[in-house]
């Protein structure tokens, strides 16, 4: 009986020591800090907003704290070019906003650019230019046409939001431009509103040079449509007035989906209609 108790005591002791040794590393191991508990460094705008909130600033005053990305048309174009360089170079920052920065935009938006682009799902305007919330006033429609609807949007951006550049951006492989190059009989088979879109594009692409390479010909057609839409936008009274005061620049752009790069059409020569 005594031998049995002794064996039992030894086994119990071994089990106790094993359990204790198993727990020991866990006690010594450092406990990782949860990611949510790590304080992120405050940005300059965060500090300004915190100070304003402590002082009891109104929402209107808080909205004014966001610094503009660009104050001139030239700065706006440079900001778009720099953002696109980051995008196609694989260095996109995809700017994120802190909660305070989002709150600062509740009552007011301050975009520095208005971009009229195609509704193609492969052409996300803010991503292409690596810009964040509130930086670009985006207007999208198939074939990036200038008509009363889109004009109303960019008029608002120019007159009330004081955007510094209006970009008309076409893109590689645009389906609307491709359809506008089809024979009239095929275009007539489309629904009414699709035909309306094609009617706004067809005049720009009917006299495209006889280029053998399909890709090169398509590029020329898209750029021809961009030139036409830029010309129409420049005739808009609100746009014309802002350009005359050097408050706005109107440029064209061609986005190459395959590379991610945007080529800008800025000079009179580049924007001249054929």
List where the protein language model places each region:
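Positively charged n-region of N-terminal signal peptides that target proteins for export
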Residues: 1-4
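Bacterial N-terminal signal peptides
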Residues: 6-16
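Sec/Tat signal peptide C-region and signal peptidase I cleavage site
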Residues: 18-22
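Divalent-metal-activated hydrolytic enzyme cores
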Residues: 23-108, 134, 144-152, 156-161, ...
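Loop/turn elements at helix/coil->beta-strand transitions in domains of secreted/extracellular proteins
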Residues: 112, 162-165
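Catalytic core of membrane glycerolipid acyltransferases/transacylases, capturing the structured
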Residues: 122-139, 145
């Amino acid at each position: 009986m005594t031998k049995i108790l002794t064996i039992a005591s030894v086994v119990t002791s071994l089990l106790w020591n094993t359990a204790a040794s198993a727990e020991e590393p866990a006690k010594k191991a450092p406990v990782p800090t949860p990611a949510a508990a790590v304080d992120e460094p405050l940005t300059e705008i965060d500090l300004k907003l915190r100070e304003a909130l402590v002082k009891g600033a109104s929402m209107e005053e808080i909205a004014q704290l966001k610094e503009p990305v660009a104050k001139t048309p030239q700065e706006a174009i440079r900001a778009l070019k720099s953002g696109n360089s980051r995008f196609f170079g694989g260095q996109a920052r995809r700017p994120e906003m802190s909660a305070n920065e989002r709150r600062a935009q509740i009552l007011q938006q301050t975009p520095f650019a208005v971009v009229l682009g195609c509704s193609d799902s492969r052409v996300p305007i803010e991503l292409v230019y690596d810009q964040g919330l509130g930086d670009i006033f985006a207007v999208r429609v198939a074939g990036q046409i200038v008509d009363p609807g889109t004009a109303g949007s960019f008029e608002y951006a120019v007159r009330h939001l004081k955007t510094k550049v209006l970009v008309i951006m076409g893109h590689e492989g645009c389906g609307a431009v491709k359809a506008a190059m089809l024979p009239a009989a095929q275009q007539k088979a489309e629904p009414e509103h699709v035909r309306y879109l094609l009617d706004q594009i067809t005049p720009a692409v009917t006299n495209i040079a006889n280029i053998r390479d399909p890709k090169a010909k398509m590029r020329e057609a898209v750029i021809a449509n961009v030139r036409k839409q830029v010309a129409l936008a420049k005739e808009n009274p609100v746009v014309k007035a802002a350009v005359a005061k050097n408050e706005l620049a109107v440029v064209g752009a061609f986005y190459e989906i395959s590379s991610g790069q945007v080529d800008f059409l800025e000079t009179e020569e580049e924007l001249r209609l054929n």
